[in-house]
């Protein structure tokens, strides 16, 4: 699988604090290797939009779509509690 980013996700990623950015990159490696990696806690977030959610850390989540053999990261946001 490959990883791609929307402009929105890239903009957010460039402004994240370094520890959050590093945690995201670590999780992105896990995502590319195995969607079901335990630390991702990946789940289908919206069936109608075919949108998935995964964990960056306890306070941050990222959202992505699966298109062919590519994961497209659409958003990286604080966890909506």
Describe these PLM feature segments.
Residues 1-2, 38:
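Solvent-exposed, charged interface segments at domain starts and junctions
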Residues 2-11, 15-22, 55-81:
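Enriched for short, Lys/Arg-rich terminal
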Residues 27:
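A small-molecule sensor/coupling module
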Residues 30-54:
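A short, surface-exposed loop/turn module that caps and links secondary-structure elements
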